[in-house]
Amino acid sequence: MAFMKKYLLPILGLFMAYYYYSANEEFRPEMLQGKKVIVTGASKGIGREMAYHLAKMGAHVVVTARSKETLQKVVSHCLELGAASAHYIAGTMEDMTFAEQFVAQAGKLMGGLDMLILNHITNTSLNLFHDDIHHVRKSMEVNFLSYVVLTVAALPMLKQSNGSIVVVSSLAGKVAYPMVAAYSASKFALDGFFSSIRKEYSVSRVNVSITLCVLGLIDTETAMKAVSGIVHMQAAPKEECALEIIKGGALRQEEVYYDSSLWTTLLIRNPCRKILEFLYSTSYNMDRFINK
């Protein structure tokens, strides 16, 4: 009890105050003007809407997805909206060699990189899991491993620009849902990996921010088709969702929550996790790794 009064309760109070009352810098569209941004999974849905928002803000954008024809239309519209420049590189994130080469090509097209927005996923349908190991492997490779490959390839440029990594995830990566086991596993993996390296970047003074975006049901065509007749809940608008993701990345927030339900946002935020992470971090001696 004495320990709680002396240490734990004050720490809890500080974290609660920080978590709920700390004010971020107000977002301004000009924060993205002239910035060099990659958006993956940008041929439709949230990715396409992010590309359009960035174009309106005057950013340089390079988009990628599998469909060359659709990407051509996205790039054309980005230029109409006022993008400083817009390019596409078509390919599949099932191919890790493509993922690595894509970043290098995008950086060359823009002359550097300020923000990497990781948004692509493999096709997912709602179903009970039985024995489809192939689908689990594919989900982990596309939804998780390719994100790591892209991040590793982009990091040298992001270090030079003090840039940002924006990781689009899901409530299914924070809370267990039925019928999405493989998808959920890949999204939980994103949280574990990127939250861990965020701590490492902080300790080793790597000035690259990582924003994890935790999304609920969004009214994209793909999502609406997948949940039709199965899930009965209100979907949030993809246009507004895309803007909130960009805002979170520009403001270098650790996490962005976007969902149609206020209660979801309130319940999913977990200050106790932050306290545990802080307490555990004090037990590590990382100097031997940082000073190599």
Swiss-Prot record:
An annotated GO BP: steroid catabolic process
- Spans within the Lumenal topological domain: 25-292
Which reaction equation describes what this protein catalyses?
A: an 11beta-hydroxysteroid + NADP(+) = an 11-oxosteroid + NADPH + H(+); cortisone + NADPH + H(+) = cortisol + NADP(+); corticosterone + NADP(+) = 11-dehydrocorticosterone + NADPH + H(+); a 7beta-hydroxysteroid + NADP(+) = a 7-oxosteroid + NADPH + H(+)
What the entry lists under PROSITE patterns is as follows: ADH_SHORT
The main location is: endoplasmic reticulum
Pathway listed for it is:
Steroid metabolism
Q: Which residues bind substrate?
A: S170
Subcellular locations according to the entry: Endoplasmic reticulum membrane
Q: Please give the superkingdom of this protein's source.
A: Eukaryota
Glycan-bearing residues: N123, N162, N207
The answer, when asked if Ligase is one of the entry's keywords, is no
- What is the reported tissue distribution? Widely expressed, highest expression in liver, lower in testis, ovary, lung, foreskin fibroblasts, and much lower in kidney. Expressed in liver (at protein level). Expressed in the basal cells of the corneal epithelium and in the ciliary nonpigmented epithelium (both at mRNA and at protein level).
Give a Gene Ontology cellular component term annotated to this protein. endoplasmic reticulum membrane
CDD domains in the record, alphabetically?
11beta-HSD1_like_SDR_c
* Activation and inhibition: Hexose-6-phosphate dehydrogenase (H6PD) provides cosubstrate NADPH, and the glucose-6-phosphate transporter in the ER-membrane supplies the substrate for H6PDH, their activities stimulate the reduction of cortisone and abolish the oxidation of cortisol.
Q: Is the keyword Ribonucleoprotein in the record?
A: no
The reported effect of E26K is: No effect on activity
Subunit field text: Homodimer.
Instruction: Kindly identify the disorder that the protein's record connects it with.
Output: Cortisone reductase deficiency 2: An autosomal dominant error of cortisone metabolism characterized by a failure to regenerate cortisol from cortisone, resulting in increased cortisol clearance, activation of the hypothalamic- pituitary axis and ACTH-mediated adrenal androgen excess. Clinical features include hyperandrogenism resulting in hirsutism, oligo- amenorrhea, and infertility in females and premature pseudopuberty in males.
Q: What does this protein do?
A: Controls the reversible conversion of biologically active glucocorticoids such as cortisone to cortisol, and 11-dehydrocorticosterone to corticosterone in the presence of NADP(H). Participates in the corticosteroid receptor-mediated anti-inflammatory response, as well as metabolic and homeostatic processes. Plays a role in the secretion of aqueous humor in the eye, maintaining a normotensive, intraocular environment. Bidirectional in vitro, predominantly functions as a reductase in vivo, thereby increasing the concentration of active glucocorticoids.
This one is known as 11-beta-hydroxysteroid dehydrogenase 1
Q: Which gene encodes it?
A: HSD11B1
